[in-house]
Amino acid sequence: MILGLGMDVVEVARIERILAGPPARVDRFLERCFTARERAYCDAARDRATRYAARFAAKEAASKALGAPAGIRFTDVEVVRGAGAPVLELAGVAATAAARLGVRRVLVTLTHDGGVAAATVVLDGEEAR
């Protein structure tokens, strides 16, 4: 049963502008929004801004799917590489909200084209009673 659905779109140029900013501001943004694993994955790529944009979109989409729970942090939602497909790992407030909803599986898809990155998140499970 689908318990939640979220979608978000991010302009890659917006992330490029942030990454081109003063180093202290860039570091604050990256540490606030992305886990160490996400930063390592994105920083290893030529298309760094595109990878960050897709992951940012996934975090926003997950928050929407969860009902935008109070206190959720960007790092509560982590995009990791699965066996050929991205996987979302939830922690903190995101994990608590998912458990409360009865979520058993989190599905995510990422895409990018034409200067935008997008993500869709589907929460699957049995409705909590």
Swiss-Prot record:
Q: What are its E.C. numbers?
A: 2.7.8.7
A cellular component annotation (GO) from this entry: cytoplasm
Report the locations given in the UniProt record: Cytoplasm
Checking InterPro entries in the record gives: 4-PPantetheinyl_Trfase_dom (IPR008278), 4-PPantetheinyl_Trfase_dom_sf (IPR037143), ACPS (IPR002582), Ppantetheine-prot_Trfase_dom (IPR004568)
Tell me the domain of life: Bacteria
Q: Supply the SUPFAM superfamilies for this chain.
A: 4'-phosphopantetheinyl transferase (SSF56214)
Q: Name the chemical reaction catalysed here.
A: apo-[ACP] + CoA = holo-[ACP] + adenosine 3',5'-bisphosphate + H(+)
Protein source organism: Anaeromyxobacter sp. (strain Fw109-5)
Cofactor (UniProt): Mg(2+)
What GO biological process terms does the UniProt entry carry, in alphabetical order? fatty acid biosynthetic process
- Gene that specifies this protein: acpS
The record's function comment reads: Transfers the 4'-phosphopantetheine moiety from coenzyme A to a Ser of acyl-carrier-protein.
Gene3D superfamilies per UniProt: 4'-phosphopantetheinyl transferase domain
What is the name of this protein?
Holo-[acyl-carrier-protein] synthase
